[in-house]
Amino acid sequence: MSAPDAERRVTERKTLRTRATIILGQTQAFEVRTLDLSTGGMGIVAQANPRPGTLMGIRFMLPLKPGGYHPFEARAKVAHSVYSASEQGFKIGLSFIDLSPEAAAAAQRFVSG
């Protein structure tokens, strides 16, 4: 079964393999692996299986050329989560919420670069 048109990815994505931290609530922080990034969201792999609609923060260092690594921080909502044996964890699709202009510009620069 396919996702409704409103939930389908509409932005270009680029592979991004790095470590990130997700923040749930005010105090819970977990390390995850990233898969890809777009201006609309990103894919991650985690050991936990969050429900669709779960809100979280995410932060990591984004590699940008030229200039090296830049901090990236965003609020996001879980769009989907499914177990992946090949990734040894849950592949989670995140949709960004109210991405700051700085974060949006950095994501666009990364995807375009």
Model regions and ranges:
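N-terminal helix initiation/capping motif
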Residues: 1-37, 47, 108-113
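Conserved hydrophobic positions within beta-strands
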Residues: 34, 76-78
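Short, conserved beta-turn/loop elements at beta-strand boundaries and strand-helix junctions
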Residues: 39, 81-87
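Short, Lys/Arg- and Gly-enriched loop/turn segments at beta-strand edges
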Residues: 63-73
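C-terminal output/interaction extensions
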Residues: 85-113
